[in-house]
């Protein structure tokens, strides 16, 4: 991950741990993102979707605050 994306992921995780169920916003870097829980999965398991620099969507799958999978 590049540094901008790392900072953005950290900021999104901080919001997630404040118990906000679904967040859609634009980061200071101009990327749109959505973070949400997946009800079909375990507790503290969620997805973080965002648009990267090239306009492609990137999907990160987290358990707690650890990235366990991603799709580009």
Predicted regions and their residues:
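Acidic, low-complexity, intrinsically disordered interaction modules
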Residues: 18-72
């Amino acid at each position: 991950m590049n540094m901008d994306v790392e900072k953005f992921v950290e900021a999104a995780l901080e919001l997630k741990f404040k118990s906000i169920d679904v967040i859609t916003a634009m980061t200071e870097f101009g990327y749109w993102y959505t973070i949400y829980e997946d009800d079909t999965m375990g507790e503290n398991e969620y997805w973080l979707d965002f648009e990267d620099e090239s306009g492609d969507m990137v999907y990160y799958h987290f358990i707690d605050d650890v990235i366990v999978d991603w799709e580009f």
